[in-house]
Every structure is written in C-alpha cells, then in structure tokens.
Design a protein with these regions (language model features):
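Conserved acidic/glycine
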Residues: 1, 5, 84-87, 107-109, ...
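Cofactor-binding active-site loop characterized by glycine-rich and histidine/acidic residues
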Residues: 1-102, 126
Length: 323
C-alpha cells in the first residue's frame, strides 16, 4: 500500500529518481517488488512512510498510539483486519486509549475491517452481531460506528459514499471530544472515548466472483492470488487481464503510463503525502546520533580468543546511543 500510494502521488520517484512515473518506471517497480535485490513485499524500514513491518500482525494499534503521543493535531487512521484482530498483541492494543491524553496527544481512529476470512479460516469478529460488537468495544472505552458495505457491495458508488459519510462522522466525533477536553488542562483530562469505525466489507471486494466454480470474492480464497497465472503458467492470462481491465486503467493513465492530471490532482501535496509525513520519517527531522560502533567492536586475531556476551557488548553501544 505504501509503495503504490507513494508511487502514484510522486513521492516514491522523488526519493528514487531511477523509478520515474512512466511505463518504464512502472515496469521496473513491478519487477523489483518482492524480488531478490529489490524491495520488500510488506512495509519494511526502507519503505517510505512506514512506521512498522507489515508482515507480522498485531502491532498496528500500539504503533499508532506511539505516533500520536505528544502530537495533539494528529489522527492515526489505523486499518485492522479481523484476522489481525484475533492476535494477542492487537487485543492488548485496544487498551492503548488508556494512555492517550485528549489535551496533549493526538487520537487513534481504528478502522476495523471485517471481511470474515483469514488465509484459510473464518474469523470470529465477523460472526458477531453489531450489538455484540458494540458491547465489546464500549467495554474497552471506544464508541463504535458501523459501516455495512457488504450489504450494498454491488453498488460501488453507494458503498464509497457510505464509507465517506462514516469517516466524516468519526473525525467529527474525535474533534468534538478533543475540543471539549481542551477547555481544561491536561491534568484535568480524563480518558477519551474515541470512535472505532467497524466496516463490514467483502474479502476480495471487486475481485473475481468465482474461479472454475469455486467462490472467490467474499471468501478466504480471495487472499493473495485469486487467478493462477505466473511466468510458467500463462494459460489463464486472458482471465487475469479481463479482471484487471475492469478497473479501467486506460481512464487513469495516459499513453506514457503516467497518472492523468485530474486524478493526480486529488492527492495531498508536500509532506501531507503518506510517504513524506515527518512523523513517519523521523530521520529527516534532525540528524540521528548513531554513535561510533567501531569503539565497541571486539578486537581479536583468532576465533575464540575472546569470550563475550552479545547483549552485554551491544548494551555498551546502546548506552552510547542515548548518552
């Protein structure tokens, strides 16, 4: 997500001029994605705008809380799949609102995405009723707002309009809570009750409905590769192209492979772009003190000459870092 968004808004090319916004640049980006010597398949430290690794699930809320501490004007919109919602760290993360002061800190807007399926299993939360989910989240100090996209998923325009309406409602609620709290001091503030947006959306929405008689959209088979095509198995490439062309790329990109101006204009500008946000790129705010690791390197001539513990030696370097 971070790679595709930053490429489309131009920031990826600003950071990597060897990947221009044209057909050749797009091909190169696709080539190096999840490829040896290329870029990671999930968010990684080198991914522009990334604040955590995307492959291991469970830390989204905790990292979002860290991003808004002492940043009172920031809202961290945090998308959580219902599969990630079942992990231990994520369940504990719902309590991160305990540590947020509505005067000094920003807010988290969890967007809990209920699609009903993990890679091979159904999920628990999607099988709960809205009433059960409301009781659960209210008990944890959140105010649930529901967006049932699944019920109107065949009408894409109506679905997007509904989700936009619920997002506006959530942001307005956050601003209302903060405005009331900021009439007083941080010392007087109590734990805020921020909204959680619970969105029921089909897994693999807008993907293939089925493949060879087996349902795809709305089930676990929508995960990752819905149509079996690779460099050595091209017999179904026409079906793949038909699906991808359903998104009408010819209306989004010009003949050179660049996003058309009327679409590009919608994107935020400057450091409002996802990959250029100073909060996610702390190293650009001020130089980082990385200390001199050479001072702590062990000097030896033959293997086994020195007996040492790695954590103790690294601890000396870490102490130098924070000195």
């Amino acid at each position: 997500v971070m790679v595709s968004n930053s490429y489309l808004d131009g920031s990826y090319t600003e950071l990597n001029p060897n990947i221009p916004q044209n057909e050749e640049g797009f091909k190169h980006l696709c080539k190096i994605f999840s490829f040896p010597g290329g870029i990671a398949s999930h968010a990684a430290p080198e991914t522009p705008g990334s604040i955590h690794e995307g492959g291991e699930l469970g830390y989204a809320l905790s990292h979002a809380a860290g991003a808004v501490l002492d940043n009172p004007d920031v809202i961290a919109a945090t998308v959580i799949g219902d599969g990630e919602g079942e992990t231990g760290p994520l369940m504990a993360g719902w309590l991160s609102n305990t540590f947020l002061n509505p005067v000094n800190d920003g807010a988290i807007l969890p967007i809990f995405y209920l699609n009903g399926g993990k890679i091979h299993n159904p999920t628990i939360f999607e099988r709960k009723t809205d009433e059960e989910l409301a009781l659960f989240f209210e008990g944890l100090g959140w105010k649930p707002i529901f967006a049932n996209v699944t019920a109107i998923s065949e009408d894409h325009e109506a679905a997007h309009a509904l989700f936009a309406e619920k997002l506006d409602e959530a942001i307005e609620e956050i601003k209302k809570v903060q405005a009331e709290a900021r009439k007083g001091s941080a010392e007087e503030a109590t734990q805020p009750v921020y909204p959680v947006l619970i969105a029921r959306i089909p897994k693999g929405w807008t993907g293939p409905k089925a493949w060879e008689g087996t349902p795809i959209e709305g089930g676990f088979r929508a995960h990752q590769v819905p149509i079996p095509v690779d460099a050595h198995h091209m017999e179904h490439v026409d079906a793949l192209l038909s699906w991808l062309e359903s998104y009408r790329p010819a209306e989004l990109f010009d003949e050179t492979g660049k996003l058309v101006p009327e679409i590009a204009e919608i994107a935020p500008k400057g450091d409002r772009r996802m990959a250029m946000n100073p909060i996610t790129n702390a190293g650009v705010i001020k130089p980082m003190n990385t200390a001199d690791w050479k001072k702590h390197a062990l000097q030896f001539n033959t293997p086994g000459e020195i007996m040492a513990q790695d954590m103790i030696e690294f601890g000396k370097y870490a102490a130098d870092l924070v000195d």
